[in-house]
Amino acid sequence: MGGAVTKSETLQKEWVPETKLEAKIIEAVQRRASRGTTMKSFNSIVLKFPKIDDGLRNCKAIFQEFDEDSNGSIDHTELKNCIRKLEISFDEEEINDLFKACDINEDMGITFTEFIVLLCLVYLLKDDSSTLQKKWTMGMPKLEPTFETLVDTFVFLDENKDGYVSREEMVRAIDESGERSSGRIAMKRFEEMDWDKNGMVNFKEFLFAFTQWVGIDENEEEEEEDNNEKA
């Protein structure tokens, strides 16, 4: 029984989370995966891009609330205050890991795009999302369906429910769309997600790529240029 095991599949089985936070994220994704996914195809995901883009922009008010000095980024102290206000039970190590994980450009500050990723990770890790809804009166009811769509999308791509998306899983998901040159498209999308180039995509990497796919980065740059011209 059983066919040949590919190098990528072997890598998946042996993959070990680097931090306690990453282990928690994988466990949370796997719990969510046990409920299944509503996504039917990669095309159905693409059709949701405009709605997801609109939903993620509701994070702006929350970002501004926790950016206490209004300098355009959330520093480590502001993040600790944010976690405390949201009554999330993260210890010091997990807060440090969360900050380090989301500060992708390593400038010691969480930008708006990075904050979107952070909020979605917190949403995933929070057992009782209704608590978040009560705490985040500024836009959270609108954010919850958007975050759930992002989690649902990752669950759809992660066929074997191990908490990671492999290159083969991405290729199969896009191949099913029936598009011409789907293999090339799948490889490009996977490379955009695989930030550390280790051949596996975790939920955090997926989120960063997704913000780019829906155009968050581009619009943020346009806003910054407009603000600079007005200054």
From Swiss-Prot:
Transmembrane segments annotated in the record for this chain: none
One MF annotation (Gene Ontology) recorded for this entry: calcium ion binding
Keywords: Calcium, Metal-binding, Repeat
InterPro entries cross-referenced by the UniProt entry: CML21-like (IPR052591), EF-hand-dom_pair (IPR011992), EF_Hand_1_Ca_BS (IPR018247), EF_hand_dom (IPR002048)
Gene3D superfamilies in the cross-refs: EF-hand
Pfam families linked to this entry: EF-hand_7
Residue stretches making up the EF-hand domain: 54-89, 90-125, 145-180, 181-216
Key word Isomerase present: no
Binding site for Ca(2+) 1: D67, D69, N71, S73, E78
Keyword presence, Cell cycle: no
Positions contributing to Ca(2+) 2 binding: D158, N160, D162, Y164, E169
Domain of life the protein comes from: Eukaryota
Positions of Ca(2+) 3 binding: D194, D196, N198, M200, E205
GO cellular component: cytoplasm
PANTHER family with a match to the protein in the record: TROPONIN
Function: Potential calcium sensor.
Name of this chain's protein: Probable calcium-binding protein CML21
